[in-house]
Amino acid sequence: MKSGIFDFLLVIPISKSIIYLGDVLLNNIALGVILITILINIIILPIMIKSTVSQQKMQLIQPEMERIQNKYKGRKDQTSQMRMSAEIQALYKKNDISMLASFTTFLTLPIMFAMWQAVQRIEILYQTNMFGINLGAKPIDHVFKFEIAYIVLLTIVALTQYFAMKINTIMSRRNTKYRETSQMQSMNMMNNFMTLFIIYFAAIMPAAMSLYWMTTNIITIVRTWYIYIYHVEKAQKEVDQANTNYLTKRQNKNK
């Protein structure tokens, strides 16, 4: 099979790293998958922090954004549009928001897809047993035989997938200013669909993929909790302080 540049740069190095770490150093290829998954998520953590903080700040400044947009509502002349754009830019600057930060998440997608491909292609992984589970077997074939290990595996995948999808909303609700928009409700519906989608594929694909999904889900939950507690909530305080300073300056100016 001919390898493309994507395989050469990402998939093959990740596959070899899993095999080396798991089979050579740890004598367990499944542990190699878990550790490389953790390592990759540590590498992309700074990108995820920047993106999540920026997205949360964007939500927090929505009332001010709407105030500016309403101020220029119906005014289509170039001067008004330029003033509105300048005020929005000033709002971003005041709250230290980069317009490009929310798009940085997309930079991580090739890496995560490469990890997915790497796990699928490591044949030795499907000959491995872990906790009484044959990682090459399809869980669905064993669930209907009431084999507990496979039932537990799919249950853990389902629960971790559900919370991995919900953790952003759960943590956002810690902020008293949080308001769920219609866009967020649509996103929640999509997340519910994705959860069912992943559970279905976890059931019909080799158990090695369930191991990968379970590890990724747990990391996502822990990572999101960490970002919100140590970065987002700090950013929320900065936005509140910036708004307070802005209002104070306006009041002093009007005196």
Question: What are these model-derived regions, one by one?
Answer:
Residues 1-255:
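Helix-loop-helix
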